[in-house]
């Protein structure tokens, strides 16, 4: 830990003056909300009859659908991603770097840490299948790998970034309008004409529109800092719009999935999710000066850098930590920790202990696997763009399959085609972890 803190302290000290620390701050805030939100939402209960119930805390929290407006922070990742990609694409726009090389480098950085996650869970499924009930193995593997939906979408948007950014440079905010128009058309087909399957296209249209707004944010920052007043107006307008389209029933209220609550704006995303993202951008702009002062302090900035350096590992492994702890807790001391009925006072009083355990387990996993965020292949990118395209399709497609179908069947049998596709895509892109250097 001391070595890591010393390393990140050097990174913090070497931060260029041109870096927008506000973007990093909100990315860290978002990952913490995601992690603790997932942990608090999870409820495991061994009922008096011995049956195991896997529940969601939002099922009994009052006005839980409205609460999701506070905890749904995925738009921040796409806003920050668009901002960062706009800055990183400068070399491509100037002709100093080929699109193929840029895409390959980004795919490696994003997918290399995913490879050990998939391999570990294939191994765990094979081992646990011999002595753990199949339904528990399936639920644990599914819970641990469902965050890969984000990687599936983000890998796709990043692979398209050289083209969508060039589109932005030509047409500017019109690109957001085009994507929003497409998303509205999909929502109409889904909710008015009863074609739910069409809604899945909005993973690209809605999140693509948010990503384009990230380009917009970056271009505004290059000219002048956006004022707090603009942020307040954007927040107020977006909030009013969000209330209007949900209160009138045009869109669901919930921004995350709530069991038994029906349709949500999350899976697949709707235009309401874009409006939530605009509201969050309003908050970012309105508080920008205060956050700049906070991040200018060395200790504050060092903390942000320390988390940012392992942010992908935290995201990928925080639910594995929960699954592994839960699997052990179900058998330790006759499952005493999980015999408390969820939603009761006793259950809420044990949440700090639950979170403490999960922070500890996640810390161990991060210490083991964070190295794969840095052990990125240095070999040249594929010579042909077709190879890169196939690699992107295989990696993004396998991530989507893992998060929706599962890496294992309900009988806890590994679906070998999925990890095979992931490894094949990683091999094509050079996204397999680089061997440890002994020099």
Annotate each PLM feature.
Residues 2-439:
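Alpha-helical transmembrane segments and their immediate juxtamembrane cytosolic regions
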């Amino acid at each position: 830990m001391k070595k890591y803190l010393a390393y990140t302290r050097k990174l913090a000290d070497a931060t260029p003056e041109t870096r927008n620390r506000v973007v990093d701050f909100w990315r860290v805030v978002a990952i913490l909300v995601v992690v603790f939100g997932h942990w608090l939402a999870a409820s495991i209960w061994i009922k008096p009859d011995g049956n195991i119930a896997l529940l969601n805390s939002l099922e009994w929290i009052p006005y839980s659908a409205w609460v999701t407006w506070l905890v749904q922070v995925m738009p921040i990742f796409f806003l920050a991603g668009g901002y960062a990609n706009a800055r990183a694409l400068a070399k491509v726009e100037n002709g100093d770097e080929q699109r193929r090389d840029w895409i390959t480098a980004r795919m490696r950085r994003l997918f290399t840490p995913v490879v050990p996650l998939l391999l570990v869970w294939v191994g765990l499924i094979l081992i646990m299948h011999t002595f753990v009930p199949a339904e528990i193995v399936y639920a644990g593997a599914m819970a641990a790998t469902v965050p890969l939906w984000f990687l599936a979408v983000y890998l796709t948007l990043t692979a398209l970034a050289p083209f969508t950014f060039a589109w932005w440079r030509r047409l500017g905010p019109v690109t957001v309008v085009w994507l929003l128009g497409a998303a509205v058309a999909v929502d109409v087909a889904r909710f008015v004409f009863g074609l739910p399957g069409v809604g899945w296209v909005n993973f690209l249209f809605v999140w693509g529109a948010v990503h384009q707004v990230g380009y917009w944010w970056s271009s505004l920052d290059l000219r002048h800092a956006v004022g707090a007043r603009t942020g307040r107006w954007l927040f107020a307008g977006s909030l009013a719009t969000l209330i209007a389209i949900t209160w009138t029933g045009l869109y669901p209220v919930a921004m995350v999935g709530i069991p038994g609550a029906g349709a949500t704006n999350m899976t697949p995303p709707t235009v309401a999710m874009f409006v939530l993202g605009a509201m969050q951008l309003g908050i970012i702009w309105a508080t920008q000066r205060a956050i700049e002062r906070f991040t200018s302090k060395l200790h504050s900035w060092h903390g942000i850098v320390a988390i940012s350096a392992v942010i992908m590992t935290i995201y990928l492994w925080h639910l594995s930590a929960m699954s592994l702890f839960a699997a052990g807790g179900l058998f330790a001391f006759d499952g005493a920790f999980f015999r408390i009925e969820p939603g009761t006072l006793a259950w809420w009083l044990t949440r700090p202990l639950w979170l403490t355990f999960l922070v500890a387990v996640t810390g161990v996993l991060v210490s083991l696997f964070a190295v794969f965020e840095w052990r990125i292949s240095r070999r040249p990118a594929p010579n042909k763009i077709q190879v890169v395209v196939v690699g992107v399709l295989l990696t993004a497609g396998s991530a989507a399959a893992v998060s929706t179908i599962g890496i294992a069947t309900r009988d806890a049998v590994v679906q070998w085609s999925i990890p095979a596709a992931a490894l094949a895509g990683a091999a094509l892109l050079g996204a397999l972890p680089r061997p440890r250097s002994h020099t």
